[in-house]
């Protein structure tokens, strides 16, 4: 069993101030795969002090120096990609094929993208006698989730490092293993002591201590809307910047002119990706009422092709959800959907056939769902798709936007101009037409209760920068 009982503070692996350990469970077996330490406010104080001290010099480093660090990180990351994938598989239950591709390479992609952007990034702008300067904001508190563990670490750390910030990272205590490897990569890449610090722990202790800390200049949080609200409340007394990427209940509008089989197949497969544990999952499929029965049959056929099994096997396409807490929540929502009268097309409560351990969920499709049902309103965060019939395009757009969330939207149409028109009316930060993937060079973030601020690409630099105007910079 792996042991990660130290924290990375000021360039050193150090013991926690007060020893307290937690077992990390492999969700596919329910057995412990690692032991970590849980930090305290005292550990946070040490990490923040190191980051604050390092900021004085690191904020003055050249673009070339920071590009070099990022490029060295990318080189080491690539060399260790197999270890990283295995850590992700163990900590959150991703099938090894997914862990080795989308999960691991997302973390690498944000590093290489940040290096590329930094080479051409403009930190100054002259306006007559005035100069506008973009400067690093300072010490950043970074709190990341378990569902895309290294993707979320990297899309915060890489831009913060690129612009000259220092930071303290609290990864999810449920899935912390890959973050430790990330710290090792930064250390080997020669990132100066104190620039990056890692303290593990839970939200009410380490997360709250970071959010409240007077020497932390900004907080970047990814997770549930409930937890994100608490981070903002804890940060409010010190008036620090807070950026958040939170929950979602994303609509997938199948327009009448779409290739129905391709659109439904794509939508179901996307919903099941990462076992439905993605904040931007297309969890509400909106289908023309007269095409609903055909769409149901297609969805059932796609679901039959899902391969549930051991996460170490290449043939497995769906792993477990991350924890017993998540499994119980998903089961309650599935049972609630049945009680509310939704039609079960496939799946349902309980473990999949042939599975007797692990937090596996039967991939489930509901139909005849109304947008007011709990399964249409709440973020289930599991492999559960709801199909909602509509009678007109206007009604579809109204249903799509009738949610407190606004992270993503999806539009399927055989006419690109038609799809563009509908996409422009969806209140969401990211809209995907006909299955288009998001690019790491475009902003990622949400409207409404899905958060604020943007990550990824050049827009991802903005949250880590302060804007200064210097008047009289040039003689009048």
Outline where the language-model segments fall.
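Rossmann-like NAD(P) dinucleotide-binding subdomain of oxidoreductase/dehydrogenase enzymes
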Residues: 78, 123-262, 390
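Residue-level signal for inorganic ion chemistry
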Residues: 30, 66, 88, 111, ...
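Long amphipathic alpha-helix in the N-terminal Rossmann-like dinucleotide-binding domain
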Residues: 49, 71-82, 94-120
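ALDH superfamily catalytic-core signature
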Residues: 226-370, 433
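Hydrophobic face of amphipathic alpha-helices that form TPR/SEL1-like repeat modules
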Residues: 1-28, 114
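Short, well-ordered beta-strand elements within core beta-sheets of diverse protein domains
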Residues: 33-39, 53-60, 107, 142, ...
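A short acidic/small-residue loop/turn micro-motif
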Residues: 15-16, 21-22, 38-42, 258
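Conserved C-terminal structural/oligomerization subdomain of aldehyde/semialdehyde dehydrogenase
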Residues: 29-35, 216, 253, 307, ...
């Amino acid at each position: 069993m792996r042991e990660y009982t130290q924290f990375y503070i000021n360039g050193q692996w150090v013991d926690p101030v007060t020893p307290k350990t937690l077992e990390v469970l492999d969700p596919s077996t329910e057995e412990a795969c690692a032991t970590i330490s849980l930090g305290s406010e005292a550990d946070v104080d040490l990490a923040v002090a190191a980051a604050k001290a390092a900021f004085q010099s690191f904020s003055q480093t050249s673009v070339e120096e920071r590009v070099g660090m990022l490029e060295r990180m990318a080189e080491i990351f690539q060399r260790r990609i197999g270890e990283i994938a295995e850590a992700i598989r163990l900590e959150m239950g991703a099938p090894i094929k997914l862990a080795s591709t989308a999960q691991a390479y997302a973390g690498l992609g944000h590093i290489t993208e940040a290096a590329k952007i930094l080479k051409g990034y403009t930190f100054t702008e002259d306006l007559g006698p005035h100069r506008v300067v973009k400067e690093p904001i300072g010490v950043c508190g970074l709190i990341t989730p378990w569902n895309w563990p290294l993707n979320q670490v990297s899309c915060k750390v890489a831009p913060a490092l690129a612009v000259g910030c220092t930071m303290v990272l609290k990864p999810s205590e449920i899935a912390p293993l890959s973050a430790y490897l990330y710290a090792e990569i930064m250390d080997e890449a020669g990132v100066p002591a104190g620039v990056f610090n890692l303290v593990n722990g839970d939200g009410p202790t380490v997360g709250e201590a970071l959010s409240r800390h007077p020497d932390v200049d900004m907080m970047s949080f990814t997770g549930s809307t409930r937890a994100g609200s608490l981070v903002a409340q804890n940060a409010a007394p010190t008036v620090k910047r807070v950026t958040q990427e939170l929950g979602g209940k994303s609509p997938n509008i199948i327009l009448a002119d779409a290739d129905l089989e391709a659109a439904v197949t794509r939508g179901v497969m996307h919903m099941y990706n990462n076992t439905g544990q993605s904040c931007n999952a297309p969890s509400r499929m909106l289908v023309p009422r007269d095409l609903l029965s055909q769409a149901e049959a297609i969805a059932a056929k796609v679901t039959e092709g899902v391969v549930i099994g051991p996460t170490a096997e290449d043939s497995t396409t769906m792993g477990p959800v991350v924890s017993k807490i998540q499994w119980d929540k998903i089961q309650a929502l599935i049972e609630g959907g049945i009680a509310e009268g939704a039609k079960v097309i496939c799946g349902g409560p309980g473990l999949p056939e042939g599975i007797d351990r692990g937090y596996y969920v039967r991939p489930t499709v509901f139909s005849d769902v109304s947008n007011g049902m709990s399964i249409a309103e709440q973020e289930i965060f599991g492999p559960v798709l709801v199909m909602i019939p509509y009678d007109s395009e206007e009604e579809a757009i109204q249903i799509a936007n009738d949610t407190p969330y606004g992270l993503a939207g999806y539009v399927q149409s055989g006419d690109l101009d038609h799809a563009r028109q509908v996409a422009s009316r969806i209140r969401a930060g990211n809209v995907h037409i006909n299955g288009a993937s998001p690019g790491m060079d475009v902003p990622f973030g949400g409207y409404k209760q899905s958060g604020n601020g943007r990550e990824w690409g050049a827009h991802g630099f903005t949250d880590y920068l302060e804007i200064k105007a210097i008047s009289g910079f040039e003689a009048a």
